[in-house]
């Protein structure tokens, strides 16, 4: 059929008076799209059939006999700004995959919820002066409308928000199970692994039966402990527990933050406010108990390597030893100072020790320094006690970044105490310094200035000795003399020196590691430490326990109440959910960003009627006090994927039968080691927050028997980012990108850009409201239609890569759809124009090769290359006198996951009554797959001089012979100096020019 694009294409793709009634333009696209979206909704086209319950109907009737496929996106925050065209990239990709698998005969679960608690929603409500629930629900409604208009094939029965009452109930229920659980590192799991969460009642039974010694009360029976002591003992074991330790306090936000929410610069991830270390009583999650499993099980899941690496680095597994130093305190008692080091071989070079300003040993320092203490060790203070108190206050007023950064002078204070080196017996002066943090390791370090830059700088500042214990390898080209007295020799390999003693402090035996390589020395010293009872080899992790409290209003309340003695009690499951009270004052109390001494005040604490409650927890009605903190926004997103299986289930967090069918480890054809969601699509920015937290919660629920797989997400795919040009005037102010005009080339290879006649500068980066370069999906729907929008986003490049948005390029996708439409539909009458003609040989081969190739591209999530192949096929059909049904129907089927509305319309006009969403994906006829010939390019000095049609199986020698014959005249009868053959497509010739 003849292609007459230029006769009718308009700049804005809108219909004009002269256009035929059934020409595919933006207006017709909108009519088609909205009509089919209504039909899909009414017929339940995308309803996925459950094993049982209310969700087993829809067009997927009897679908539970089919294999399952669970695809999902990282659900969005319901922002007040709504969506711009960059947001749906992942949603569209997942939708294409879901539609493809549906056409392969699988029962596809694809749904969308909303992550509605937390700081983003609360801050938007504060800005608008409205209650968070009002603004959040309005934002959800707008976002749901935008997504629906996109034609995403969600099962809308499964949609929910994390603020929904029934959802909050189960989030609180999960917390209660983690509170009522402890981690037993020696327990053998059902999968044969070691270490598991267990019910706290089993721990109590072990205490009662004396099977396990009660920490701190070895001489007492469990029944002899009062309830406060019992609660304290259990708190030290619980997975969800109350901690009083240094936390990240952010005065500017009025709340504490998890480590993962603090940037490398020591600022809050949201708002960029300073963050300070404070000792506060907070809820924490014992994620560190799962550190090893979180690392090891990365090997069982199909995730991008960069995300796995980010999680491994964040968890920070290291191998070393715990070493115990004796410290004689001011009260005459000898106390233990535990240090973790990855280099126990350097004990011979340890010349002092340092503790954090929050280390408990500082409660046992003397009143004053001895007369022999150097003035440089006193920090200018006359009194040790007063100096220590002031130094601690100064350190706590700094951010973690300021305390640990290498730049600047090293500060510290001698504590008046000495630690005894367990190997050499040397008395090591014990300092307190701000660069050691209590939240990392043990809050104490053994300082080795000969091998560590910070220790070296500290030693120089305080006049402490430097001992080198490692020298460079002989073939390294380095000499220790180049470092001696000038810098530390920092190396993980080398030859050990200055490391021997005739009589060790602890055992009195001789110990020497001189002459050994570092790794051998580490092993030998670790063995000695264990034999001496002053150390043990162990694995340590950078990962800290997850701070789980927030002093905010807009979050899930904890299902916890406190009695008159301050003992925490779980609210019974029958009382869940604990709802947020509607309070007039929900804004957090914030402070000046640098007010490190400010105190958190939770908004819920202001509502006394809600805080004070009468409950019967088994021993009569008593007065209790609710916990006034709320959970972080990560709580709701930790487990939402499971609620898609049945968001209306009032009896279970997730039903075991539904879990086995949708996420189990023994599904036919999907015997994954990990089980879990088949495909999870989202941004890489969530690698160490949401993804790590979800894996942790899931493993705990797995241990406790609530789920049947150890991992939540089997395959993870990170989409790239859609970026855009922004424009600034001479003042550096952003101007509306859609009002900028592109002018002539400036003469240096770049076009010029003007805004209302004024020259502006172009920059490339993110799309955002402040940059005035946002394009909304609503604009695309109105001016091009949802299918053109979908087609453009999917054709822009590989899904995993970032790409620039350019509205001017959208028209290319529109023209492709117009050409395809004309191949099926008469623009004047709307009638179907395809014929029943048989396919010629050329069309048969092109069609079947296209089916084979597009299937491969869809499996690999490469819709951009699939689209390119479909365009080639459509162009061929356009060149035919008549378009045969046998060729165009497979084309429409293959395009339908990408442009579903227009394909539904064409499928209907082709005479089909069943939705194309459930039509069978085409299968190629292998007799017509594979090319008869391929084009071989012959190059001389990099320039193409001939093209040959050859057998795709031709060998290199035959291809070389044909190529030389084809360019013989250009070689002037001479043999070439070199011939490079890459059969069957390239021959590169280097001529002999001598």
Regions found by a protein language model. Give the residues of each.
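Basic, alpha-helical terminal appendages of large translation-related enzymes
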Residues: 1-64, 374, 465-474, 487, ...
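Residue patterns forming the tRNA-binding/recognition surfaces of aminoacyl-tRNA synthetases
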Residues: 2-29, 34-35, 39-43, 128-337, ...
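Conserved oxyanion/phosphate-binding beta-strand-loop segments in alpha/beta enzyme cores
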Residues: 2-13, 17-72, 102-111, 135-141, ...
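Long, charged, mostly alpha-helical binding arms that flank functional sites
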Residues: 23-27, 134, 317-322, 471, ...
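Amphipathic alpha-helical
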Residues: 37, 284-318, 360-413, 576-609, ...
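N-terminal catalytic cores of NTP/NDP-binding nucleotidyl/phosphoryl-transfer enzymes
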Residues: 54-132, 136, 160-171, 339-342, ...
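Catalytic alpha/beta core of large soluble enzyme barrels
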Residues: 94-95, 107, 364-473, 478, ...
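Helix-rich, typically C-terminal accessory recognition domains appended to large enzymatic cores
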Residues: 115, 186-193, 236, 241-248, ...
């Amino acid at each position: 059929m003849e292609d007459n694009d230029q006769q009718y294409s308009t700049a804005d793709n809108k219909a004009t008076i002269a256009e035929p009634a059934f020409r595919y333009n933006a207006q017709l696209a909108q009519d088609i799209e909205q009509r089919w979206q209504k039909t899909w909704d009414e017929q339940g086209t995308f309803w996925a059939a459950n094993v049982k319950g209310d969700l087993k109907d829809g067009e997927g009737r009897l679908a539970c006999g089919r294999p399952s496929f669970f695809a999902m996106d990282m659900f969005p925050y319901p922002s007040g700004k709504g969506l711009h065209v960059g947001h749906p990239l992942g949603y569209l990709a997942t939708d294409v995959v879901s539609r493809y698998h549906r056409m392969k005969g699988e029962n596809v679960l694809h749904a969308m919820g909303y992550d509605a608690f937390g700081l983003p929603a609360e801050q938007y409500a504060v800005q608008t002066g409205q209650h968070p629930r009002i603004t959040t629900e309005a934002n959800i409604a707008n976002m749901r409308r935008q997504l629906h208009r996109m034609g995403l094939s969600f099962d809308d029965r499964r949609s929910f928000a994390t603020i929904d009452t029934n959802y909050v109930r189960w989030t609180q229920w999960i917390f209660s199970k983690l509170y009522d659980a402890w981690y037993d590192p020696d327990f053998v799991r059902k999968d044969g692994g070691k270490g598991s969460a267990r019910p706290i009642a089993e721990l109590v039974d072990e205490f009662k039966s004396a099977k396990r010694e009660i920490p701190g009360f070895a001489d007492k029976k469990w029944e002899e402990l009062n309830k406060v002591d019992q609660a304290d003992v259990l708190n030290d074991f619980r997975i969800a527990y109350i901690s009083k330790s240094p936390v990240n306090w952010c005065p500017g936000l009025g709340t504490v933050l998890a480590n993962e929410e603090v940037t490398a610069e020591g600022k809050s991830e949201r708002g960029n406010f300073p963050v300070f270390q404070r000792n506060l009583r907070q809820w924490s999650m014992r994620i560190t108990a799962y550190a090893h499993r979180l690392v090891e099980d990365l090997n069982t899941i199909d995730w991008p390597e960069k995300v796995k690496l980010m999680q491994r680095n964040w968890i920070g597994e290291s191998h070393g030893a715990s070493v115990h130093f004796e410290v004689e305190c001011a009260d005459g008692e000898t106390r233990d100072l535990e240090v973790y080091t990855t280099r126990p071989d350097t004990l011979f070079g340890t010349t002092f020790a340092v503790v954090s300003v929050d280390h408990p040993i500082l409660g046992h320092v003397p009143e004053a320094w001895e007369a022999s203490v150097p003035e440089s060790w006193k920090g200018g203070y006359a009194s040790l006690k007063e100096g220590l108190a002031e130094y601690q206050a100064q350190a706590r007023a700094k951010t973690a970044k300021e305390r640990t950064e290498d730049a600047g002078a090293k500060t510290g204070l001698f504590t008046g105490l000495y630690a005894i080196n367990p190997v050499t017996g040397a008395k090591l002066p014990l300092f307190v310094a701000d660069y050691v943090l209590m939240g990392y390791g043990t809050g104490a370090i053994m300082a080795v200035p000969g091998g560590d830059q910070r220790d070296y700088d500290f030693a120089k500042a305080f006049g402490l000795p430097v001992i080198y214990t490692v020298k460079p390898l002989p073939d390294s080209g380095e000499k220790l003399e180049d470092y001696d007295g000038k810098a530390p020799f920092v190396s993980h390999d080398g030859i050990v020196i200055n490391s021997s003693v005739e009589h060790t402090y602890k055992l009195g035996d001789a110990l020497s590691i001189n002459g050994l390589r570092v790794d051998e020395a580490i092993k030998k010293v670790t063995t000695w430490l264990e034999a001496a009872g002053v150390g043990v080899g162990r694995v340590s992790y950078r990962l800290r326990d997850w701070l789980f409290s927030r002093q905010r209003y807009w979050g899930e309340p904890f299902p916890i109440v406190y009695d008159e003695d301050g003992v925490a009690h779980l609210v019974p499951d029958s009382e869940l959910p604990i709802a947020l009270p509607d309070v007039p004052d929900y804004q957090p109390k914030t402070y000046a960003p640098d007010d490190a001494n400010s105190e958190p005040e939770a908004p819920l604490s202001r509502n006394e009627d809600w805080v004070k409650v009468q409950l019967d927890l088994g021993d009569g009605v008593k007065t209790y006090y609710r916990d006034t903190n709320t959970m972080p926004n990560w709580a709701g997103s930790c487990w939402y994927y499971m609620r898609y299986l049945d968001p209306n289930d009032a009896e279970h967090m997730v039903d075991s039968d539904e879990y086995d069918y949708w996420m189990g480890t023994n599904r036919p054809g999907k015997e994954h080691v990990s089980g879990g969601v088949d495909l999870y699509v989202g941004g890489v920015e969530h690698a160490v927050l949401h993804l790590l937290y979800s894996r942790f919660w899931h493993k705990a629920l797995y241990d406790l028997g609530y789920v049947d797989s150890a991992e939540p997400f089997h395959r993870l795919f990170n989409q790239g980012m859609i970026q855009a040009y922004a424009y600034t005037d001479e003042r550096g102010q952003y101007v509306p990108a859609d009002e900028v005009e592109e002018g002539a080339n400036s003469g240096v290879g770049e076009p010029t850009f003007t805004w209302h006649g004024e020259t502006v500068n172009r920059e490339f980066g993110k799309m955002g409201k402040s940059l005035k370069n946002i394009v909304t999906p609503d604009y695309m729907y109105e001016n091009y239609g949802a299918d053109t929008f979908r087609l453009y986003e999917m054709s822009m490049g590989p899904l995993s890569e970032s790409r620039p948005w350019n509205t001017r390029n959208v028209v290319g996708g529109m023209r492709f759809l117009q050409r395809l439409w004309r191949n099926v539909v008469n623009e004047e009458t709307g009638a179907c124009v395809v014929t029943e003609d048989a396919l010629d040989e050329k069309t048969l081969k092109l069609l079947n090769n296209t089916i084979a190739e597009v299937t491969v591209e869809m499996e690999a999530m490469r819709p951009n290359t699939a689209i390119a192949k479909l365009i080639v096929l459509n162009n061929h059909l356009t060149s035919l006198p008549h378009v045969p049904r046998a060729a165009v129907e497979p084309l429409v089927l293959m395009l339908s996951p990408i442009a579903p509305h227009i394909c539904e319309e064409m499928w209907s006009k082709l005479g089909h009554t069943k939705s194309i969403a459930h039509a069978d994906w085409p299968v190629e006829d292998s007799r017509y797959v594979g090319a008869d010939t391929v084009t071989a390019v012959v190059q001389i000095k990099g320039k193409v001089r001939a093209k040959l049609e050859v057998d795709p199986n031709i060998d290199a020698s035959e291809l070389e012979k044909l190529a030389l014959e084809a360019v013989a005249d250009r070689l002037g009868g001479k043999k070439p100096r070199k011939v490079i053959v890459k059969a069957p497509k390239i021959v590169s010739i280097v001529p002999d020019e001598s």
